[in-house]
Amino acid sequence: MSKASGFLKEFRDFAVKGNAIDLAVGVIIGAAFGKIVDSVVKDLIMPLVNYILGGSVDFSNKFLVLSAPDGYAGPMTYADLTKAGAIVLAWGNFLTILINFILLALVVFIIVKAINAARRKEEEAPAEPAAPPEDVVVLREIRDLLKK
């Protein structure tokens, strides 16, 4: 067998194994789930925070200018300041990402907790005793007949 065909066989064995496929599915679902959490934060939670705080609070545009370039007179937006070389602490973006992470971790925790509870329930359920083999049944019948 040539090295190339051996390599291809080894790769096929790796790719077809359940663990590699499970990992690939998990990564794809995780990426999609991350987008859902991001949308929940941006489209549901942040509008509620804005409503509660009584204004238009967009944390992603909150920042602190640590050092602006000398003589800078342009717009005081995060994108323009960083483009001009300012040192900017983007605390609002960090806060938004932190909220995303906390929500994602909370949802994963709830899912894992539910799965563990289902597994415990499955383990706690007493298994029905297996039916005795046919030869044991016949021997018991013979024993019972001999007792009579």
UniProtKB/Swiss-Prot annotation:
GO terms for molecular function: mechanosensitive monoatomic ion channel activity. Keywords: Cell inner membrane, Cell membrane, Ion channel, Ion transport, Membrane, Transmembrane, Transmembrane helix, Transport. It holds the Pfam family MscL. Belongs to the MscL family. The gene is mscL. This is Large-conductance mechanosensitive channel. Channel that opens in response to stretch forces in the membrane lipid bilayer. May participate in the regulation of osmotic pressure changes within the cell. InterPro entries: MS_channel, MSC/AndL, MscL_channel. Homopentamer. The keyword Membrane applies. GO terms for cellular component: plasma membrane. The chain crosses the membrane at residues 21-41, 45-65, 92-112. Its main location: membrane. It is a multi-pass membrane protein. It is found in: Cell inner membrane. It comes from Bordetella petrii (strain ATCC BAA-461 / DSM 12804 / CCUG 43448).
